[in-house]
C-alpha cells in the first residue's frame, strides 16, 4: 500500500498549517484536530480498500507463440465496484512490450477490454505469473498493488509464420518467396507422370513414338521429380552457433531455415527429419505428410545452443546407425579451420550411404571488416585478422569440396534461400 498524491497533498497542507500555528495565527488544538481528521480518513480509507474485492481478470493469448513475431494480447477486467486501476501484465523473460502499463476506470456490470503487444525473444516454455494491478482506494488516498491470476504457460516456437504463409502457395511459389531461384523444367524428372499431347518446347526424348503412331499425333511422356525421398537436417547446436545477428542466434537462424526447407520437401512428397547435435541431442525420424511439421516444431522449440564443442564424427556415426535409407543430409554449422579434420572424417562416413551438403554460416561483420576503410593501426589489424580468418575458412570449404561435398557459404539471412535452392537442385538433377 502506497500513499496516493491526494494524501501527500493533505500531509503537505497539514505541515504548512503547522507553520501558521507556530506563528500564532491559529490555536495549537486546530493543528492537532486536522492531524486527527487526516489520520482518521486515511485509516478508514485503508480499511475500506483492504476489504474491497479484486477485479476478475482474463487473458486472451494462444499457448503457442512464434519467436521474434509481435503478438497482440488481450486483457479483460470485470468488477463489482467502481475503481481506478493501473494494469501491468507480468510478461516472462523481459520481452519488449508496447502499450503497458495502462490506467483504466472500471465500472460494475461493464467488462473493460484492453490490449498490448509483446515480442518473444527466446524459444522454449515460459510462464505468465499473473496480472499486476495498482488499485486506487475509494477516497483516493492510497494505491494498493495486487497480483492476480490468471497464470499461463506458453510455448515459444521457432518462427513458423512463413510456413503458414507458404500454405497459400504452390511449392514453386513458396520457394520464390524465400528468395530461391527455381529453374523450371516442363515435363522432366525421374518418375513417369502421364501421357499428353506434344507441346512446343518439349524435348525429342519425351516423345513416345508408339503412342504417336497409334494416336496419329505427337504424344509426349511427362515426368515429375521422384517423391518419397529422404531429407535429414543436421543442426549444430554447439558453441559455433552462439553468435548473434539480427536479434537471433545463428542456431535460431539455422532452425528457422531448416523448417522452411523441410516444409517445402514435405510439400513435394518427400520425408523430412531433424537431428540436433553438439549440445542436447534431438532426433526426429524422417517422415512424410504435413503433420511432420508439428513434430519438428515440438521437438525443437526448446533447443538452445550450448557452449560445448560439437563431435561431428560421433554425430555421423549415430546418423549411420539410425538412418538406413539413402538421404540428403544437410548439415548447418559454422565451419572453422580447427574443426576440419573431425568434419572430414564425419562426411566421409556419411557419404558411404548419403548425399551430403554442408551449409556454413558466415558473419556479416566479416564482410564489413574487409570493405571498410583503413585509417588507423587498429583498423589495419582488424582487416588483417578478418582476411586471415576468411582465408582459413575458404581453405576448410575447399577441403570439403575436394571430398565431393556440396558446400554453401552464406550469411544467416540468405540461408533459407540457399538451402531451398540446393534441395531443389538435388531433386532436379536426380542425385538421390
Go through the PLM ranges and name each one.
Residues 1-58:
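Extracellular/lumenal glycan-associated context and N-glycosylation machinery
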Residues 2-7, 31, 339, 423-432:
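C-terminal signal-anchor/stop-transfer transmembrane helix together with its immediate cytosolic
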Residues 388-429:
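C-terminal helix of von Willebrand factor
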Residues 292-328:
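Von Willebrand factor
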Residues 294-296, 365-395:
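Acidic, Ser/Thr-rich peripheral helices and adjacent loops at domain boundaries
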Residues 335-341:
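Active-site glycine- and acidic-residue-rich loops that bind
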Residues 357-367:
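Short, flexible loop segments at boundaries between secondary-structure elements
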Residues 36-291, 326-331, 345-349, 359:
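An amphipathic, basic-hydrophobic helix/alpha-beta surface used to engage anionic
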Amino acid at each position: 500500500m502506497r500513499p496516493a498524491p491526494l494524501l501527500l497533498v493533505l500531509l503537505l497542507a497539514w505541515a504548512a498549517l503547522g507553520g501558521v500555528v507556530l506563528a500564532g495565527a491559529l490555536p495549537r488544538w486546530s493543528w492537532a484536530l486536522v492531524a486527527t481528521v487526516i489520520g482518521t480518513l486515511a485509516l478508514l480509507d485503508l480499511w475500506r480498500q483492504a476489504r474491497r474485492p479484486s477485479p476478475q481478470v482474463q487473458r486472451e493469448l494462444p499457448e503457442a507463440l512464434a519467436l521474434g513475431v509481435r503478438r497482440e494480447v488481450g486483457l479483460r477486467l470485470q468488477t463489482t465496484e467502481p475503481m481506478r486501476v493501473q494494469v501491468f501484465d507480468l510478461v516472462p523473460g523481459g520481452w519488449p512490450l508496447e502499450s503497458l502499463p495502462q490506467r483504466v476506470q472500471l465500472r460494475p456490470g461493464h467488462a473493460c477490454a484492453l490490449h498490448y503487444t509483446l515480442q518473444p525473444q527466446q524459444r522454449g516454455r515460459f510462464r505468465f505469473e499473473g496480472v499486476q494491478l495498482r488499485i486506487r482506494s475509494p477516497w483516493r488516498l492510497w494505491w494498493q498493488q495486487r497480483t492476480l491470476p490468471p497464470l499461463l504457460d506458453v510455448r515459444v516456437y521457432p518462427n513458423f509464420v512463413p510456413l503458414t504463409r507458404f500454405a497459400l502457395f504452390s511449392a514453386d511459389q513458396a520457394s520464390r518467396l524465400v528468395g530461391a531461384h527455381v529453374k523450371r523444367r516442363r515435363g522432366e524428372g525421374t518418375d513417369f507422370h502421364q501421357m499428353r499431347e506434344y507441346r512446343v518446347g518439349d524435348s525429342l526424348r519425351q516423345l513416345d513414338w508408339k503412342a504417336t503412331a497409334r494416336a496419329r499425333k505427337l504424344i509426349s511422356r511427362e515426368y515429375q521429380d521422384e517423391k518419397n525421398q529422404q531429407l535429414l537436417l543436421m543442426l549444430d547446436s554447439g558453441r559455433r552457433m552462439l553468435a548473434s545477428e539480427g536479434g537471433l542466434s545463428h542456431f535460431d537462424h539455422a532452425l528457422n531455415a531448416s523448417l522452411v526447407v523441410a516444409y517445402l520437401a514435405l510439400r513435394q512428397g518427400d520425408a523430412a527429419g531433424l537431428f540436433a547435435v553438439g549440445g542436447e541431442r534431438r532426433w526426429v525420424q524422417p517422415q512424410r505428410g504435413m503433420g511432420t511439421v508439428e513434430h519438428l516444431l515440438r521437438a525443437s522449440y526448446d533447443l538452445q545452443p550450448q557452449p560445448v564443442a560439437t563431435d561431428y564424427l560421433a554425430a555421423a556415426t549415430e546418423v549411420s546407425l539410425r538412418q538406413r535409407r539413402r538421404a540428403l543430409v544437410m548439415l548447418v554449422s559454422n565451419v572453422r579451420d580447427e574443426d576440419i579434420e573431425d568434419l572430414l572424417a564425419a562426411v566421409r562416413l556419411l557419404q558411404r550411404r548419403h548425399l551430403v551438403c554442408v551449409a556454413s554460416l558466415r558473419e556479416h561483420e566479416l564482410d564489413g571488416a574487409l570493405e571498410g576503410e583503413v585509417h588507423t593501426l587498429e583498423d589495419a589489424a582488424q582487416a588483417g585478422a578478418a582476411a586471415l580468418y576468411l582465408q582459413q575458412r575458404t581453405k576448410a570449404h575447399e577441403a570439403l569440396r575436394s571430398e565431393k561435398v556440396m558446400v554453401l557459404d552464406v550469411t544467416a539471412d540468405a540461408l533459407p534461400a540457399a538451402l531451398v535452392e540446393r534441395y531443389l537442385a538435388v531433386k532436379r538433377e536426380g542425385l538421390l
